Amino acid sequence: MSWQTYVDEHLMCEIEGHHLSSAAIVGHDGAVWAQSTAFPQFKPEEMTNIIKDFDEPGFLAPIGLFLGPTKYMVIQGEPGAVIRGKKGSGGITVKKTGQALVIGIYDEPMTPGQCNMVVERLGDYLVEQGL
């Protein structure tokens, strides 16, 4: 299965009539493996900061998680495994696997819990596969 198929069929899937606004799978080096059409352009240092927060939990809390034009307030995740962010009625979930970051961005009416479920389910699967 291609990385784009994982994004299209597993991250952008419909959950209770809703789906993520955008999603991507990005390598730890910041290279995009696959992304949805609406996924924001980001700066390399934004991905570097996300990786740094996985290595040093709490790093992003005082500065926020930036991805493209959006700044998310970092909320409780799972140190070293999941980062969650909030911006107005939407937010972001980032799950770290052995080789990649699985990223989902949502807006209402999708809920944070639905976004977490979609992103973490694929991330957990990739971890089980050694990826």
From Swiss-Prot:
CDD domains: PROF (cd00148). A motif (Involved in PIP2 interaction) lies at residues 81-97. InterPro entries: PFN (IPR048278), PFN_euk (IPR005455), PFN_sf (IPR036140), Profilin_CS (IPR027310). Its main location: cytoplasm. GO terms for molecular function: actin monomer binding; proline-rich region binding. It comes from the Eukaryota. The modification Phosphothreonine is found at residue 111. Signal peptide: none annotated. GO terms for biological process: nuclear migration; regulation of actin cytoskeleton organization. Keywords: Actin-binding, Allergen, Cytoplasm, Cytoskeleton, Disulfide bond, Phosphoprotein. The keyword Cytoplasm applies. Pollen specific. One of its GO terms (cellular component) is cell cortex. It is found in: Cytoplasm, Cytoskeleton. Phosphorylated by MAP kinases. Occurs in many kinds of cells as a complex with monomeric actin in a 1:1 ratio. The variability of the residues taking part of IgE-binding epitopes might be responsible of the difference in cross-reactivity among olive pollen cultivars, and between distantly related pollen species, leading to a variable range of allergy reactions among atopic patients. Belongs to the profilin family. Binds to actin and affects the structure of the cytoskeleton. At high concentrations, profilin prevents the polymerization of actin, whereas it enhances it at low concentrations. By binding to PIP2, it inhibits the formation of IP3 and DG. This is Profilin-3. The lineage of its organism: Eukaryota, Viridiplantae, Streptophyta, Embryophyta, Tracheophyta.
